[in-house]
């Protein structure tokens, strides 16, 4: 699916004949997204395409494509007039690939969403997490800076931060709240945050940090607790699973809808001056509350199915994250549209339908459900 498009910017700009009133249509803005195949990347791509952008995504080469979240908007690049999303091979661990594609694509905006983003996994692979999340951001910032110097162009940069950076700092957490990271992932995100601030202050780069609190959707990875719950719930409802094993049910998070949060990313890069913003719903809910709403929605009692497994507790727990997004609301004019219960039910609906399709395959003998508890 990835394309090697080495054309200049003029090749990818919209070329529209003047209308009768001689008004010339402005060229399309071009965005470059790392992590385009992830939850946030897919929603941001949809959002930017809706704004008339041409979107380029950087994807890693692997043994199989992980593009299911963007397949519905992919158009073969040979269809030049309609293919406004293009994919290219690159990696945040490879500085030369980042610089090469920025020079080729000539983006107006760069959104760095790629990461090893699982907190628990970061304890297992801390070196890799730091290389991708922290040093990867530094490589991309340097590629953008070098490109702007050589080309004389202005490129706006968005860095995806995380509420995990606050760690054990008491809520509510705002842009002025001190960081106290409690995992290799969170520490790496702190480094990326300060690299972004440094490049803004030292080189005048238009660079923003979005400190996003937990944001979920039906596209959330199945190894994250919210999606793990709704995925298991769907399978339990149709008889494919009997147990769900979880860790700390009292952990409280500020959960929003990922589709809402990508608008805030874009709004940050439309301001006159770059700055950092917390993006959150300003509501806190525990994992147990998520279980109450999700299982209750399907008429089930979660206590009949959930068991606690110590392996899912982190070496250093983060108990309570709840954001103060007043700055984003005031400056950006942003506010969340999807509330907690609506979000949970949205995810349950999608995963129930997925489980029903899965059951058809299991009943037909095309899948084996025995690996589930």
Curated annotation (Swiss-Prot):
GO CC term, one of those recorded: cytosol
One Pfam family hit: GDP_Man_Dehyd
Binding site for NADP(+): 35-40, 60, 91-92, 113-117, 128, 189, 215, 220
InterPro entries: GDP_Man_deHydtase (IPR006368), NAD(P)-bd_dom (IPR016040), NAD(P)-bd_dom_sf (IPR036291)
Feature: compositional bias, Polar residues: 1-15
Signal peptide: none
Disordered: annotated segments: 1-21
Annotated coiled-coil segments of the chain: none
GO biological process assignments: 'de novo' GDP-L-fucose biosynthetic process; unidimensional cell growth
Cofactors that this protein relies on: NADP(+)
Pathway: Nucleotide-sugar biosynthesis; GDP-L-fucose biosynthesis via de novo pathway; GDP-L-fucose from GDP-alpha-D-mannose: step 1/2
Record GO terms (molecular function): GDP-mannose 4,6-dehydratase activity; GTP binding
Catalytic site positions: 162, 164 (nucleophile), 185 (nucleophile)
Catalytic activity: GDP-alpha-D-mannose = GDP-4-dehydro-alpha-D-rhamnose + H2O
Binding site for substrate: 117, 162, 185, 214, 220-228, 247, 253, 314-317
EC main group: lyase
Outcome (variant: residue 153 to C): In mur1-5; strong reduction in L-fucose in the cell walls
Alphabetic keyword roster: GTP-binding, Lyase, NADP, Nucleotide-binding
Family: Belongs to the NAD(P)-dependent epimerase/dehydratase family. GDP-mannose 4,6-dehydratase subfamily.
Assembly information from the UniProt record: Homotetramer. Binds to GER1.
Protein name (Swiss-Prot/TrEMBL): GDP-mannose 4,6 dehydratase 2
Species name: Arabidopsis thaliana (Mouse-ear cress)
